[in-house]
Design a protein with these regions (language model features):
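Active-site activation/catalytic loop segments of kinase-like enzymes and analogous catalytic loops
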Residues: 158-181
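Catalytic-loop of the protein kinase fold
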Residues: 123-125, 130
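ATP-binding pocket architecture of kinase catalytic cores
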Residues: 1-123, 136-140
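ASCE P-loop NTPase motor core, strongest for the SF2 helicase catalytic module
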Residues: 117, 135, 153, 163-166
Length: 181
């Protein structure tokens, strides 16, 4: 048991014939999911509390003893950034329909700019953002983190960076970023 709020898993199906891949069923949580990172449906104090709660839960996630909960072999510790760059480059190449010079430049630039030094290793979510959280119906309290398919052992700073990415994206062209707010 940890302080990380997750929906309880009810069943796992490993038969690919059912829906084309493995899947699991989890409990239903009655709560709120905020799709827009500006959280326009709440006031400023509530918005601050929501983001404070995200930070609190992220710290709890990264404080989990992977050995203590039996996850020491959950992923490959070390080289997290290189593994992620390789994974996303392969996925991009598999779905690429035309050459994008900006993406090509990024794919070339990233491997040469991986942070130097020893990476911290923790349980990371891999997709830690506001709309992957279920909040209590009336309180700014996370009752469940969703979408764990990218979770692994890796550098916890990557989760923090992913969470903060919304602050860098503009709020235009269908992107719900927070830059300039």
């Amino acid at each position: 048991h940890t302080d990380v709020p997750v929906p309880q898993a009810i069943a796992l199906c490993t038969d690919d014939e059912i829906i084309g891949s493995m899947f699991y069923v989890m409990e239903h949580l009655d709560g709120r999911i905020f799709w827009d990172p500006a959280v326009p449906e709440v006031n400023n104090a509530q918005r601050t509390a929501i983001y404070d709660e995200m930070n609190r839960v992220l710290a709890a996630l990264h404080s989990v003893s992977v050995e203590g909960v039996g996850l020491s072999d959950y992923g490959k510790p070390g080289n997290y950034y290189a593994r992620q760059i390789g994974r996303w480059t392969k996925q991009y190449r598999a779905s690429e329909t035309e050459l994008d010079p900006d993406m090509e430049a990024l794919i070339e630039w990233l491997p040469d700019h991986i942070p130097e030094g020893e990476e911290s290793v923790a349980l990371v979510h891999g997709d830690y953002r506001l709309d992957n959280m279920i909040f209590h119906p009336t309180e700014p309290r996370i009752i469940g983190i969703l979408d764990w398919e990218l979770s692994t052992l890796g550098d916890p700073l990557a989760d923090l960076a992913y969470q903060l990415m919304a602050w860098q994206f503009p709020r235009e062209g269908g992107i719900a970023g927070l830059a300039g707010l």
